[in-house]
């Protein structure tokens, strides 16, 4: 007589056979073999953002990440995410899905990439948790393309939760270091996707606007033989048997291009600053949007051109990127960015008067501190209702050696900064284009003339009057969106304490 265990084993085998036989959907789900470009099937993958009521009752294929999953009886709800868009998907026991298929779907790890075939169905009640609120996907086939590990270093729902909301109800939020240590996952959040799509828009609008204005895009060297501005805040690199430096600015080369008769130039590229500044707005590497332009009679021709370029960028962002702006504001609420046309321009002495009236003690030739910049921004907003303005005629003593002195007041200079929400985003000036005056100013600043010989020599053969400035891309993004740390708007930030990832 067989043992009880043997009897049980004998009973289990036919049950397994029955279960396998009942899994009529076994060909409709599973883990796909690795895609190694073995074939190119004639299959169109529909974008999640295009799943609307216009596609109701269509059978579509979608590739997306599993954002969340929730099993309930004989059905499983998935939220499928593709960049900043998501849609609800339903796997339910029926003609196309077996209970084994539902179980398989429910157990797919979050962040896995899957291919799904399903029917787009209009829903009676809006799905508030998804961007595609009017439809859901009724799944007929589901295949895992890339399986994520079960333990994630951070949860995306926590990463997009407003900090205030987390503090109020005790739910988790994700701190900055955790985000940056796991940047690839953090960049998947809808907020990060929106930030960097808008930042891409800034570059596009900058380039588009300037090309329409007759500017020429140039590329300048980042490995140079001497510190860009004769200063010490440079990174030194080994260059064969000599030392070289990473460029602090493309300015000297922009000016050389003006001397070479290009008249109007701009460039977009990395800028390196070896400054041990651990603040909310400083990076050791950032993207510079740089402009240089010859003018006819007055450097204000250039100031107006740069200010108008920034205004065109602001208008373009508000017209073309409302979805991204609203996505970011859900997590980081902020007042809409305001600006005037034409741009408000104040002289430095006017700013000093406003600050002194507010109780700040400052000398006439003293530079603005960060707190005073922010205070001035609030005062300007109260008085003029603008977040963007130009501050003109800085004291000569606080500007670099190549800055043109004001001919009427030797203590002032033909220089300017531009501000967004009380923080500087551009520093610029009319450059000295006379080699003799340039030499005098360099010596006044204690700069070794031999190290800037090539720069000074470029003005010896006729140089037009010109001016320009450099804009920090990450700062513009941060301040336009009302964010509080430039690391949020740098894809892989570099600061004195971070060199990875």
From Swiss-Prot:
In the record, which positions carry Phosphoserine?
A: 249
Look up the EC number in the record and give it. 6.1.1.12
Q: Give the reactions, separated by semicolons, that this protein catalyses.
A: tRNA(Asp) + L-aspartate + ATP = L-aspartyl-tRNA(Asp) + AMP + diphosphate
Q: Which GO terms describe its cellular component?
A: aminoacyl-tRNA synthetase multienzyme complex; cytoplasm; cytosol; synapse
Q: Write out the residues that bind L-aspartate.
A: 229, 273, 427, 431
Give the similarity note.
Belongs to the class-II aminoacyl-tRNA synthetase family. Type 2 subfamily.
Protein name in the entry: Aspartate--tRNA ligase, cytoplasmic
Q: Which organism is it from?
A: Mus musculus (Mouse)
Lineage, opening ranks:
Eukaryota, Metazoa, Chordata, Craniata, Vertebrata
């Amino acid at each position: 007589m067989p043992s009880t265990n043997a009897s049980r084993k004998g009973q289990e085998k036919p049950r397994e056979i029955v279960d396998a036989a009942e899994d009529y959907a076994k060909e409709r789900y599973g883990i796909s073999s690795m895609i190694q470009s073995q074939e190119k099937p004639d299959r169109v993958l529909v974008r999640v953002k295009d799943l609307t009521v216009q596609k109701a009752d269509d059978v579509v294929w979608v590739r997306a990440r599993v954002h969340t999953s929730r099993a309930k009886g004989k059905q499983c709800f998935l939220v499928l995410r593709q960049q900043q868009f998501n849609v609800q998907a339903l796997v339910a026991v029926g003609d196309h899905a077996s209970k084994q298929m539902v179980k398989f779907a429910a157990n797919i790890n979050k962040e896995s990439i899957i291919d799904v075939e399903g029917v787009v169905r209009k829903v009676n009640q809006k799905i508030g948790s998804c961007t595609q609120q009017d439809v859901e996907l009724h799944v007929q086939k589901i295949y895992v393309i890339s399986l994520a590990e079960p333990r994630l270093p951070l949860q995306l729902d926590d990463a997009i939760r407003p900090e205030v909301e987390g503090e109020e109800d005790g739910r988790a939020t994700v701190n900055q270091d955790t985000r940056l240590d796991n940047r690839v996952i953090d960049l998947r959040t809808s907020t990060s996707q929106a930030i960097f799509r808008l930042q891409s828009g800034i570059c596009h609008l900058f380039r588009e606007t300037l090309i329409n204005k007759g500017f020429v895009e140039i590329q300048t060297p980042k490995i140079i033989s001497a510190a860009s501005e004769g200063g010490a805040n440079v990174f030194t690199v080994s260059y064969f048997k000599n030392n070289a430096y990473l460029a602090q600015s493309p300015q000297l080369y922009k000016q050389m291009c003006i001397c070479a008769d290009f008249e109007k130039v701009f460039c977009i590229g990395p800028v390196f600053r070896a400054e041990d500044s651990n603040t909310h707005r400083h990076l050791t590497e950032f993207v510079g949007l740089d402009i240089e332009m010859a003018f006819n009679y007055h450097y204000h021709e250039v100031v107006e051109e740069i200010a108008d370029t920034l205004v065109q960028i602001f208008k373009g962002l508000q017209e073309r990127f409302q979805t991204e702006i609203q996505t970011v504001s859900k997590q980081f609420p902020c007042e809409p960015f305001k600006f005037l046309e034409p741009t408000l321009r104040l002289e430095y002495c006017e700013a000093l008067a406003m600050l002194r009236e507010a109780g700040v003690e400052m000398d006439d030739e003293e530079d603005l501190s960060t707190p005073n910049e922010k205070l001035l921004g609030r005062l300007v907003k109260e008085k003029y209702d603008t977040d963007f303005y130009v501050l003109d005629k800085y004291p000569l003593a606080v500007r670099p050696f190549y800055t043109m002195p004001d001919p009427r007041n030797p203590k002032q200079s033909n220089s300017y900064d531009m501000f967004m929400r009380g923080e500087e985003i551009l520093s610029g000036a009319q450059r000295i284009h006379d080699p003799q005056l340039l030499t005098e100013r360099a010596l006044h600043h204690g700069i070794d003339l031999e190290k800037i010989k090539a720069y000074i020599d470029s003005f010896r053969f006729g140089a037009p009057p010109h001016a320009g400035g450099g804009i920090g891309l990450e700062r513009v993004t941060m301040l336009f969106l009302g964010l509080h740390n430039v690391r949020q708007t740098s894809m892989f930030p570099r600061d004195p304490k971070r060199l990875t990832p």
